[in-house]
């Protein structure tokens, strides 16, 4: 039947998203300018932040780039922020964008090796509890040297590989469309697939939390860690040792949570790998091993060598993370014989939509800065007593990181703490303790939602999430035990262990106070 032009426009707007969702976005776009001009720019700013979080929460209804982008464009158009401020935020976070564009694409060209290693791991460890612990530990270790996004990209690649192998076998698809379950025609196969999805969901969440457990420990683990370390004048070893009073107890209890939720099948964990899936993966592995030519074996060896280069380059910070990723692309494609432009393009398909989304997010961050949305909170915290400041900085960082971006929150708070030190409001010792509280506050409680951790948001908006039915709400629910334990143990560490342990480490000669002058930290 014929439809009117108005109906055609409405159908095209945000595509197949539900009508109620389309109406909600339209409502936001109508209300925001009215509130900004006739009520309060501050209120309008917070409304924009909440609306953007809503688009992230509804990521499976509609990719957040479009609705979030419309809100961001309007915010710039009505004067909530300026194009210059947005460009400045993008420039400040160029390292993160380069990471997404190049590092994630670089990992794509190492998928053969990763799938080989993790398939062996999965098939040889039959205990789900031990396997979950192995994934969590591996992610934590890798995240201490690589960026968490890189690690999540690795695990996503592996999980998509597992899912594709089984789905193609059980659905008999000639076109290999892994999003279409119509080829699975019996109830048993459907139930097995659902169990396999639950199994992969739990592994992904363990790996995701593992990136937070490891990423908080070192100055290269997360982008904001590097900013905090630079402000405090710490090198790699200084940063690691100063964080230990808080990060070590959190790490131990985080692993304990991993074991308990698997053992007692809590919060959606505990799903076993179906035996039928194990058989399919085992047969695939045996066939792949039998068919593997010398040329393919050499590709695996080359990828392993490139993997060593990747870890060393990042651990020693030989170049910016994104540039290291570019070197991985060049080395892997050169020595594995991938020279076709079309083949190269596939590597960027996963990362570029998220890169665009993160750029939109920086526009929202520009609004937060322009409208001083966090200023009242920061002023309140700095008015507290020195002993209360540590816990308040930790808690407010955690709260804001859960609804905002932890890179932004960490940067804002360390700059405010640094400014307070330079103006004589806090002492040097207090500033360094605040730096620890800020770092742990931005990294630990932020696992509560995908908004705080870029790695979690990347997972939520990846091609894997809809395949394994990993929604925003399910991620929050499955992260809950980790969130509670990591936040509470981290708070107790900041409250009771940080000061005495730092004093003991200083007396033992493990750490020394830097001399900070003219805005530059210079270790003795």
Curated annotation (Swiss-Prot):
<feature type="transmembrane region" description="Helical">
    <location>
        <begin position="13"/>
        <end position="33"/>
    </location>
</feature>
<comment type="function">
    <text>Na(+)/H(+) antiporter that extrudes sodium in exchange for external protons.</text>
</comment>
<feature type="transmembrane region" description="Helical">
    <location>
        <begin position="325"/>
        <end position="345"/>
    </location>
</feature>
<keyword id="KW-0997">Cell inner membrane</keyword>
<keyword id="KW-0739">Sodium transport</keyword>
<feature type="transmembrane region" description="Helical">
    <location>
        <begin position="358"/>
        <end position="378"/>
    </location>
</feature>
<keyword id="KW-0472">Membrane</keyword>
<feature type="transmembrane region" description="Helical">
    <location>
        <begin position="304"/>
        <end position="324"/>
    </location>
</feature>
<feature type="transmembrane region" description="Helical">
    <location>
        <begin position="479"/>
        <end position="499"/>
    </location>
</feature>
<keyword id="KW-1003">Cell membrane</keyword>
<keyword id="KW-0406">Ion transport</keyword>
<feature type="transmembrane region" description="Helical">
    <location>
        <begin position="98"/>
        <end position="118"/>
    </location>
</feature>
<dbReference type="GO" id="GO:0015385">
    <property type="term" value="F:sodium:proton antiporter activity"/>
</dbReference>
<dbReference type="GO" id="GO:0005886">
    <property type="term" value="C:plasma membrane"/>
</dbReference>
<keyword id="KW-0050">Antiport</keyword>
<dbReference type="InterPro" id="IPR004671">
    <property type="entry name" value="Na+/H+_antiporter_NhaB"/>
</dbReference>
<feature type="transmembrane region" description="Helical">
    <location>
        <begin position="140"/>
        <end position="160"/>
    </location>
</feature>
<feature type="transmembrane region" description="Helical">
    <location>
        <begin position="448"/>
        <end position="468"/>
    </location>
</feature>
<keyword id="KW-0915">Sodium</keyword>
<keyword id="KW-1133">Transmembrane helix</keyword>
<feature type="transmembrane region" description="Helical">
    <location>
        <begin position="239"/>
        <end position="259"/>
    </location>
</feature>
<keyword id="KW-0813">Transport</keyword>
<comment type="similarity">
    <text>Belongs to the NhaB Na(+)/H(+) (TC 2.A.34) antiporter family.</text>
</comment>
<protein>
    <recommendedName>
        <fullName>Na(+)/H(+) antiporter NhaB</fullName>
    </recommendedName>
</protein>
<keyword id="KW-0812">Transmembrane</keyword>
<dbReference type="Pfam" id="PF06450">
    <property type="entry name" value="NhaB"/>
</dbReference>
């Amino acid at each position: 039947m014929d439809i009117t032009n108005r109906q055609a426009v409405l159908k095209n707007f945000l595509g197949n998203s539900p009508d109620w969702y389309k109406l909600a976005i339209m409502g936001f776009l109508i209300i925001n300018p009215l509130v900004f001009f006739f009520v309060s720019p501050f209120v309008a700013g917070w409304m924009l932040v909440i609306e953007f979080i809503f688009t992230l929460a509804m990521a499976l209804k509609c990719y957040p780039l479009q609705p979030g982008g419309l809100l961001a464009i309007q915010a710039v158009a009505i004067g909530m922020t300026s194009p210059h401020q947005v460009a400045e935020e993008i420039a400040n976070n160029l390292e993160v964008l380069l990471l997404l564009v190049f590092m994630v694409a670089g990992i794509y060209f190492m998928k053969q090796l990763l799938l080989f290693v993790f398939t062996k791991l999965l098939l040889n460890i039959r205990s789900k509890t031990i396997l979950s612990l192995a994934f969590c530990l591996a992610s934590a270790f890798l995240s201490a040297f690589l960026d968490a996004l890189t690690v999540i990209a690795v695990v996503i690649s592996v999980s998509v590989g597992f899912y594709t192998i089984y789905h193609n076998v059980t659905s008999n698809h000639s076109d290999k469309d892994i999003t279409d379950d119509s080829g699975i025609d019996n109830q048993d196969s459907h139930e097995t697939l659902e169990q396999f999805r639950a199994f992969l969901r739990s592994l992904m969440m363990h790996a995701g939390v593992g990136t937070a457990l490891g990423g908080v420990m070192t100055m290269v683990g997360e982008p904001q860690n590097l900013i905090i370390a630079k402000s405090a004048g710490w090198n790699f070893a200084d940063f690691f040792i100063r964080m230990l009073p808080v990060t070590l107890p959190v790490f131990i209890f985080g692993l304990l949570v991993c074991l308990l939720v698997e053992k007692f099948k809590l919060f959606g964990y505990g799903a076993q790998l179906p035996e039928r899936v194990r058989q399919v993966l085992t047969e695939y592995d045996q066939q792949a091993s039998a068919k593997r030519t010398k040329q393919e074996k050499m590709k695996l060896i080359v990828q392993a060598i490139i993997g060593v280069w990747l870890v060393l380059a990042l651990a020693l910070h030989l170049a910016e993370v994104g540039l290291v990723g570019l070197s991985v692309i060049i080395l892997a494609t050169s020595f594995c014989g991938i020279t076709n432009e079309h083949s190269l393009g596939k590597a960027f398909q996963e990362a570029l939509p998220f890169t665009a989304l993160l750029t939109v997010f920086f526009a929202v961050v520009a609004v937060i800065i322009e409208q001083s949305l966090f200023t009242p909170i920061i002023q309140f915290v700095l008015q507290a007593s020195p002993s209360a400041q540590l816990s308040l900085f930790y808690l407010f960082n955690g709260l804001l990181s859960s609804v905002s971006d932890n890179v932004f929150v960490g940067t804002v708070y360390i700059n405010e703490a640094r400014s307070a030190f330079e103006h004589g409001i806090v002492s040097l010792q207090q500033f360094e303790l605040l730096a620890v509280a800020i770092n742990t506050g931005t990294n630990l409680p932020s696992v509560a939602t995908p908004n705080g951790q870029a790695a979690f948001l990347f997972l939520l908006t990846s091609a894997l999430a809809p395949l394994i039915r990993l929604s925003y709400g399910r991620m929050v629910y499955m992260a809950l035990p980790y969130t509670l334990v990591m936040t509470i143990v981290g708070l107790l560490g900041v409250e009771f262990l940080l000061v005495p342990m730092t004093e003991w480490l200083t007396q033992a000669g493990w750490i020394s106070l830097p001399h900070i002058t003219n805005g530059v930290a210079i270790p003795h």
